[in-house]
């Protein structure tokens, strides 16, 4: 089952991406380096729940 998640910027800008992941194959929290257009740099995005 694929669940929708939110990837929140660790830079504190409030920018986020939405995506989905398979919880069976990836049970741990997701961390990925992506581009933050607010500060125009690549930063680590961490998984958070969609409210």
From Swiss-Prot:
One of its GO terms (molecular function) is structural constituent of ribosome. Keywords: Ribonucleoprotein, Ribosomal protein. Pfam families: Ribosomal_L33. GO terms for biological process: translation. GO terms for cellular component: cytosolic large ribosomal subunit. Gene3D superfamilies: Ribosomal protein L33 (2.20.28.120). InterPro entries: Ribosomal_bL33, Ribosomal_bL33_CS, Ribosomal_bL33_sf, Ribosomal_zn-bd. NCBIfam families: PRK00595.1, rpmG_bact. PANTHER family: 54S RIBOSOMAL PROTEIN L39, MITOCHONDRIAL (PTHR15238), LARGE RIBOSOMAL SUBUNIT PROTEIN BL33M (PTHR15238:SF1). Belongs to the bacterial ribosomal protein bL33 family. This is Large ribosomal subunit protein bL33. It comes from Colwellia psychrerythraea (strain 34H / ATCC BAA-681). The gene is rpmG.
């Amino acid at each position: 089952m694929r669940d929708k998640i939110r990837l929140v910027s660790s830079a504190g800008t409030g920018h986020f991406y939405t995506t989905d992941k398979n919880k069976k194959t990836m049970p741990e929290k997701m961390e990925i380096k992506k581009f933050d257009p607010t500060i125009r740099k690549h930063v680590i995005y961490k998984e958070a729940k969609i409210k």
